[in-house]
Structures are given as C-alpha cells and as structure tokens.
Amino acid sequence: LTAILAPAAWAAEGTDEAQAEAKTTLTAADAAQMQQADAAVTALTGSEEYEQMSREQRRAAALDELDGLARKGLVRRSSIRTDEENGIVSFTYSCGVLGGILFTPADELEEMTLDAGENGLRPPRGLAEASPSAEMPLTEDVREAAAARQNARQSDENALPDTIGRAAIYYAFDNTVNSSRFPYYSYMQGFWEGMGIRTTMNTRVTLADLRRMDRYDLCILSAHGAYYTYSYGALWKRTRTEPIILLTEESTFYKDIVYSFELLSHRVIKMNGLYCATADFFRNAYRAGQLSSTIVYSETCEFLGVTGSVDESMAEALLAGGARAVLGYVNNVYTVYSRSMLWDTVNHLGMGMTIGGAVTHAKDTYGENDIIWYTEQGGRRPHAAAAYLVLYGDPNARLNVPANYSVAQRADEITVDDIFGEVLDRAA
C-alpha cells in the first residue's frame, strides 16, 4: 500500500508545482501568503538574536523557520536547499516564486577585514580610521586634471562643457543610517560633480529604478551580490546557480502584485524579504537595446560568479541590452579595494581616458586583484579566492571629454583643494 500511495502523493505534489509554474500572474491570495511567509522570515533575520548567532546557528534557525512555513503550506518543502558555500538557504513559495534566507550576511561575505570577526582576519594598517580623502587619495594626474578643468571654465578660450557625462550611483549596500560606507560615496559624488560628471545618488534603489539606467552615460551598481542556487522542475528536480543583485527594496503585498510576472518568471527573487534582480531581469528590461549610450560598472560580489564557475550571464544580459561596456567582479571582493578601484577608474574617465585605459590605471594603482591590494596594506590572512575586475564590451568607450583637453596647459594657477575644498573638508 505504501509503495502505491507514496508515488501518488509525489505525483500530486508535482502536479501542484507544474500548475504553479505555469502561472503568469499572482492572485491576491498568492500575494497574501507570500507576505505571511516574508513576515516570518524578516522577523527572524531582522532580530537581534539572529545577528548574534554563529553561522551554524543562523543556518539551523533558517531551516527551522522554513520547516514551520512548509507545515503551513506557505513554502514547498521539496524546494528547501542549503548552499553552504554561499551561505544561503533557498526555497520556493507555494505559488512558485523563488526566495532565500542569507545565513552568512552579505557584509561578512565581503568583509573589509577591519576587525577579527568570525573570519579571524587581521586588519590592514590604519584603514579602520581612514577618512574618505585619506583612504582614496587623488593621484597627481587627477589633481592636475581637476585644476585644468576649472581653469578652462574660467577662460573663454577652449572652454570645456559644463557636463561631460551623466552618472548614477545605485547605492543599495544599506539605508545610509549610521553607515560606514555611505560617506565615501557621498564624497565621490561631490568630486565627480566638480569634474563635470553630473552624478545622481540613488539611496532607495528599486526594481523600477533599474529599468531606467538608459538615462545615464555611466551606471554604478553599488550593492551586495550573491551566487544563488535553487531547485526547479515539477517531477524531475534540477538545480541552477546564478548571480543576483540584492536591493534594499522591501517586499509588499502591492509590489508583489505589480511584479508578479517577473517574480513568477524568476527574473526577480526575494532574499530575506527583499527584492533581488537576476540577469534575466536586465535582459528583459533592455530587450530593445536601450543601453546603447551606457557604461555599467558593478561593485557587487560574485557579479560574474566564482572561480571555477565563472558566470557571464549578467554581463551578457547588459551587453544584449546595448551597453557599451560592462565591468564586474569574479568572487567576493573586499569593500575598500572595490571602491578604490571605482574611484580611480571614474576619475580617469573624467579626464578623458577610455574605460579600458581607466581600468588599467586603477589596476596599476591598486593591484590586479584584491589579495594583492590586501597584502600590500599589511594584511596577513586574506580570503581564499582573489576577486578581480573584468571588462566586457568596448574598451574604447569613454565620456564626452573634448579631444583638446590638455592637463599640462591648464593646471598652472589653481589647485584641486581650491576647487573642492568644501567637499574635502566635509569628508575629512
């Protein structure tokens, strides 16, 4: 009897899953059930107790929570999967939408190594107390270029345009409150504005915002990333792993309905009750090639997967959307290395360099990968796999800097501190 009934039960579950996967819209009941599950997940992951737990305790707590949700019929028990390497428990909601719980928070995956923490890492020299201007000093050529730009503005002859490009920083590392990261990005925004790169800072990044990247010449994705593995298939289970970008946009009943098609098609998933974008999200958003004037620079961890399993789907999706060039990291990247590379690259784009030349300059300055940078700072116990920046697309892409822009002829009378003194003082 058992031998006959068990396959029948499995078949029934598989039929339910097949029907759910055939959906193209979420019902109000589906969204309400997801919100019930999300409330339980966020109550766990947002608790002080969860924050104080060890990695193993978090994993156990996540599995226990999902077990309870499976008993209530809110998630599919057969979909629950633990990814030890990437610190995620993935699952599927009963309606077919993908979700996950991070038991290794993103900040730990890309830890700056400023404290021992669970990783037992020693800090590089003095970086714990570094101000933005100290951590990210101006190279001499950038100082001269900034001064030259101001001189050119003051002269009618060979005057430069007020704007050499439009940039957007999509800042989704945190909500900026008591943030150790945000002051650096505010500093960069102010400096780039002075160079003539009109820079928008978006600190409440939504999926809708990521559909409007074609408005800018340079888009900077400053967010956490992860390598997400999930199970799919009604009767024959298979697994798939792909990079995702974690946003700070909270899931709501209304947004679940609005995003229903993208959630059900797995272009968007939920992690800790927050929305995340996949490569297919970008592929669909820019299927008409709207990014033809845009360079995309991603700081997210594992944007291109990991060593031994490089995944170019994010870069390919953006290039298919017309992006002139796409930059991103393989593996988890140290925070300071990542933003230092960004700082140097964009500074040199503002000087008129091509994106290929600017990236080469940044690597020459800070190292080919983050372990080289880490050891040069005096670090003694680097993480296991070096993160390195890869450029796809046209290495000759550049901002609208005039060909007659001459640093040497225009840097005699003014210093960068005169131009950006207020920015430097505020960031110090």
Feature map (PLM): residue ranges:
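Structural alpha-beta junctions
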Residues: 72, 189-201, 318-329, 353
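Structured catalytic cores of large enzymes
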Residues: 69-168, 305
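Surface-exposed patches in mature extracellular/periplasmic domains of secreted proteins
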Residues: 77-79, 200-208, 329-331, 355-358
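Long terminal accessory regions outside catalytic cores
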Residues: 12-108, 116-119
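Active-site-proximal C-terminal subdomain of hydrolase catalytic domains
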Residues: 295-426
